[in-house]
């Protein structure tokens, strides 16, 4: 199967000679190039019964690497199950108009933080309004910066429980079909973002801001989940997704990459796109986040502070389990991912492989 690593191995050096990369972009390229190769060391499993020997090299664990997200995703899903309430959940997505792309990309850390701030305030302020819910809610928000064709398209996915705590400490359920009116969410988000953008970046072109204010911003809310059990599994699709997965890469020949993408504007049809390797690398690296940037955040009673004071009450009021859920071991998570015991020989079925560590080659 064609991988991003193959494209980087063939073209990244030439690309770096003609393009200026940030430190994080350089680190990401190097990590993906070395992922699951002898450069990072690994281990050797030997079956004492039949002698079958298999070598596995270590992953780079870079959060932008298409090969390194599965175990991290399963660990995250497992840890989040303890936070589930026995209510429905809504999926709300906030997007910015493309006219702001240049401003956002040239000030990524500040602008991504501003997006999170405005999204969380918009949801929590409207939820607390008696006209809508009249209760304090919580949410988990995840930043994505890409569109299906690897374009720059910053947006935030939110998973929000269908209700909240009122001032009397009682649980209030939201309406079944929608959490909050989409138009109200869109306009409040637009007003907050543009007002704070003016304060943070006073040199921003005023005509650009006026044009953005006169547009309807896209916010959409998907129908509620029927059960809480599938919420974190669903959210896991978004939390550890990277700009493009290897299974969407179709062909790499004569310096051209062909990949498939879903066109949401054309009835979600799958299409194919052909671009040069240099353009593919440029698009991929646009989505490397600033160093240490937190792309998954929790607010309200799902924040660190909220968990200590209010989450247990919410679980009690909604009939959710109050018992702490036992976290799965790495072995059990691997069994879930692989569908087999990693300590069982794939040749003869014997359980109890002998493992030997393999050090990276000397520099």
Task: Identify the residue ranges that each predicted region occupies.
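Beta->alpha loop/short-helix hinge microenvironment recognizer with preference
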Residues: 1-363
């Amino acid at each position: 199967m064609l991988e991003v690593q193959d494209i980087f191995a063939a073209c990244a050096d030439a690309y770096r000679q003609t393009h200026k990369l940030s430190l994080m972009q350089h680190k990401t390229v190097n990590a993906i190039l070395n992922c699951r190769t002898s450069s990072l060391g690994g281990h050797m499993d030997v079956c004492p019964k039949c002698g079958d020997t298999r070598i596995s090299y270590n992953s780079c664990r870079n959060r932008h690497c298409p090969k390194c997200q599965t175990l991290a995703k399963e660990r995250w899903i497992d840890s989040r199950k303890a936070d589930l309430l026995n209510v429905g959940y809504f999926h709300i997505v906030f997007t910015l108009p493309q006219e702001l792309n240049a401003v956002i990309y040239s000030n990524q850390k500040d602008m991504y933080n501003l997006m999170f701030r405005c999204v969380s305030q918009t949801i929590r302020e409207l939820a607390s309004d008696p006209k809508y819910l009249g209760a304090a809610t919580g949410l988990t928000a995840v930043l994505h910066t890409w569109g299906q064709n690897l374009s720059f398209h910053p947006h935030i996915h939110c998973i929000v429980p269908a209700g909240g705590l009122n001032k009397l400490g009682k649980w209030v359920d939201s309406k079944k079909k929608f959490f909050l009116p989409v138009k109200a969410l869109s306009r409040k988000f637009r007003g907050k973002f543009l007002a704070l953008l003016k304060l943070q970046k006073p040199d921003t072109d005023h005509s650009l801001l006026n044009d953005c204010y006169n547009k309807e911003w896209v916010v959409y809310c998907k129908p509620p989940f029927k059960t809480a059990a599938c919420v974190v599994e669903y959210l896991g699709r978004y939390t550890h997704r990277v700009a493009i997965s290897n299974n969407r890469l179709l062909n790499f020949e004569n310096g051209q990459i062909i990949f498939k993408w879903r066109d949401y504007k054309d009835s979600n049809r799958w299409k194919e796109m052909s671009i040069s390797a240099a353009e593919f690398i440029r698009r991929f690296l646009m989505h490397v986040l600033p160093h240490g940037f937190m792309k998954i955040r929790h607010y309200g009673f799902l924040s660190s502070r909220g968990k200590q004071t209010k989450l247990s009450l919410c679980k009690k009021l909604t009939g959710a389990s109050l018992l702490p859920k036992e976290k799965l071991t790495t072995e059990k998570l691997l069994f879930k991912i692989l569908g087999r015991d990693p300590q069982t020989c794939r040749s003869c079925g014997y359980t109890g492989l002998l493992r030997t560590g393999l050090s990276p080659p000397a520099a």
